[in-house]
C-alpha cells in the first residue's frame, strides 16, 4: 500500500496515526511538538523542508521568525532517534535552508 502509515528507518518504526515510535523493542516518547516535527519530515522523505515551512507546519503561521525553536527541537529528535546525534544519518541539516529526512 502506497500510504503505509508506518515509516521505518534504521531500527526505528514510526506509526504516525497511532503516534507510536519504537526502537527495537523499546518505545520512545516524543512531546507533541517533537512528534509534529518528525511527522512533517517523514511525510516528505528525501525532500528539503525550509525552516519557514517547518515552523508554519509545527508551530503555526505566527512562529515563522522563531527558527531557534526549530534548532532546539531538531536537537531533541536527534538525541532520541539518531545512533550518533552529532553525525545524523536520517535527520539532516541543509545549512541555511532547512532540514531533510533521509530514510
Model-predicted segments: where are they?
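Basic, amphipathic DNA-recognition helix from helix-turn-helix-like DNA-binding domains
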Residues: 1-8
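Positively charged, aromatic-enriched patches within helix-turn-helix-type DNA-binding elements
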Residues: 18-97
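Generic detector of short alpha-helix boundary/capping microenvironments
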Residues: 7, 13, 84-86
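Conserved catalytic Walker-motif region of ABC-type ATPase nucleotide-binding domains
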Residues: 9, 14-16, 101-103
Amino acid at each position: 500500500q502506497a500510504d503505509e502509515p508506518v515509516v521505518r528507518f534504521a531500527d526505528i518504526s514510526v506509526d504516525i496515526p497511532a503516534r507510536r515510535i519504537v526502537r527495537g523493542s523499546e518505545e520512545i516518547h516524543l512531546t507533541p511538538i517533537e512528534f509534529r516535527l518528525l511527522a512533517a519530515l517523514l511525510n516528505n522523505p528525501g525532500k528539503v523542508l525550509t525552516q519557514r515551512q517547518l515552523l508554519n507546519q509545527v508551530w503555526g503561521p505566527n512562529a515563522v521568525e522563531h527558527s531557534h525553536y526549530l534548532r532546539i527541537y531538531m536537537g531533541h529528535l536527534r538525541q532520541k532517534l539518531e545512533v550518533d546525534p552529532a553525525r545524523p544519518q536520517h535527520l539532516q541539516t541543509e545549512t541555511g535552508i532547512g532540514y531533510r529526512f533521509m530514510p
